[in-house]
Amino acid sequence: MANVKINNISARQILDSRGYPTIEVQITLSNNVFAKASIPSGASVGKFEAVELRDHDTNYYHGYGVTKAVNLINSEIGQKIIKLETLDQEKIDNALIEIDGTNNKSRVGANSILAISLAVAKAAASTLNIPLYQYLGGITAKILPTPLINIINGGMHADNNLDFQEFMIIPHGANSFEDAIRMSSEVFHTLKKILKQKQYNTNVGDEGGFAPNIKDNTEVFDIIIDAIEKSGYKVYKDFSLGLDVAASTFYKNEKYKFSDYQFSTHELVEYYKNIVTQYPIISLEDPIAEEDTLGWKMITKELGDKIQIVGDDLFVTNCKLIKNGIDNNMANAVLIKPNQIGTLTETLNAIRLAQKNNYNVILSHRSGETNDTTISHIAVAVNCGQIKTGSLSRSERLAKYNELLYIEKLLNTSAIYQGML
């Protein structure tokens, strides 16, 4: 398989699940193998994420077009990447970083770079005639992740009055990934019936979860627990709950304002301590704003030995920020979104750093998704044991779950379901 090189790179503009433009790249190799990758985009974006390249022409897709990025891939970037050795992922990714030349990928865009990076990895796996998870993880890749399923959407992911962004069910009591999806589907459909009975709407948000206008967060917990129990399952034993608070979205002037209340950092941490005691919540994502360093230290000290405290906006898949969090005892888990950093190599480095320091790792989608299933393969490749990829509706979310079901079948008796976080 030596000397299989990139022969052609072709990019085009497609639409993501929210109807905004994004990039799809096809890589063709010298052996005529080809592969495609497409890139998601977030609604709730961390301040320190690598930069997407957009057209900013308000007369074209309201400024969200990506024709500049597509043209760069089809010209300057492509010319410098063609003829590179396909199986040397790190060399290709470093070349892409060098072509950009900035510390936040703002010249050619993290979206341009990542589309190429992922397509190269897929083409390399196809060349070796092995699945992507095996190409990236080798024979040790066998853990199917526990899904954190966003069953009710709020915040920036839905047009409703819920302040918290995601209310998740976590099927840690399942015996297999297939079992986890079945159990979660049953709860999802039971929840729909309960919402209808309570005369709440059952429209879905960006990530496929229901988006009812429920004013009180605690009522959401009660309704989800009711759905779990009416589906024949038990909280703590079969399911627990997770929250993506996205606290940066309601943090201003060193105060947190939601549900008609205003909280200091200390008061907010006390609020979390209270709901974690009252409800089966085992994971809190972005419970504190990314710039509230003292708040992160406080909540990790108070709850870090009891539940999973996940940094998303805090870390943005960036090794430097993850190391800072580790050194300062902030959070105990890292959310990984490849488009926050821009290359597969940097993504894998961030995962390794977190795992080496005993931080949990969760692979994650974005609110504006495509049918690309790369994150499913990365999750299994690194044995991270957790994945966030939306609810059990909307095909761009289900594509990832269905790919994991396929991977579980490929692994056969070698497959291990993570279960408890």
Curated annotation (Swiss-Prot):
Per its UniProt entry, what is the enzyme's top EC class, as one word?
A: lyase
Give the cofactor binding note.
Binds a second Mg(2+) ion via substrate during catalysis.
What are the record keywords, sorted?
Cytoplasm, Glycolysis, Lyase, Magnesium, Metal-binding, Secreted
Question: Pathway it belongs to?
Answer: Carbohydrate degradation; glycolysis; pyruvate from D-glyceraldehyde 3-phosphate: step 4/5
Specify whether Transport is a keyword of the entry.
Answer: no
Name one cellular component (GO) term. cell surface
Keyword Lyase on this protein?
yes
Question: Which residues are the active-site ones?
Answer: 207 (proton donor), 337 (proton acceptor)
Instruction: Extract the coiled-coil ranges from the record.
Output: none
UniProt: Mg(2+) binding residues = 244, 285, 312
**GO:BP terms for this protein?**
glycolytic process
InterPro entries xref list = Enolase (IPR000941), Enolase-like_C_sf (IPR036849), Enolase-like_N (IPR029017), Enolase_C (IPR020810), Enolase_CS (IPR020809), Enolase_N (IPR020811)
For the ligand ((2R)-2-phosphoglycerate), the binding residues are 165, 337, 366-367, 388
Tell me, what's a Pfam family for it?
Enolase_N
The cofactor(s) it depends on are: Mg(2+)
Drop me one GO molecular function for this one: magnesium ion binding
Record-linked Gene3D superfamilies: Enolase-like C-terminal domain (3.20.20.120), Enolase-like, N-terminal domain (3.30.390.10)
Assigned EC number: 4.2.1.11
Q: What is its main location?
A: cytoplasm
Q: Which SUPFAM superfamilies match?
A: Enolase C-terminal domain-like, Enolase N-terminal domain-like
The UniProt function text for this chain reads: Catalyzes the reversible conversion of 2-phosphoglycerate (2-PG) into phosphoenolpyruvate (PEP). It is essential for the degradation of carbohydrates via glycolysis.
Q: Which NCBIfam families match?
A: eno
Family under the similarity heading: Belongs to the enolase family.
- Name-wise, this protein is Enolase
What is the native source organism of this protein?
Answer: Ehrlichia ruminantium (strain Welgevonden)
